[in-house]
């Protein structure tokens, strides 16, 4: 049986350590990009809120096209609006602002839309929940 060369073993270990470092740096880079994208997309949500509020008061085709285009871009990036109205209240998806007349523990009103990014909460919705009158 041939003797193991200690220098060869040390070189193999160093090479394996280097390969692990490369993998770890790449994983960190991907996580950082996801974090930055999440922060950026979250900052766009109040802009959508403002544009939708303006759209409700001003009937302008250009404004509607701009809102639709922004929503399309967000959708392409994995941002989805939550549809919570008339569904069971889920504290993981929404914050309850107040209890209101309506079916117990069911969302009866949405004060601020909530959004998901790749099926994770980007911004929780702010809702009114039925108190079961």
Located regions from the model:
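Structured alpha/beta interaction-core segments
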Residues: 50-133
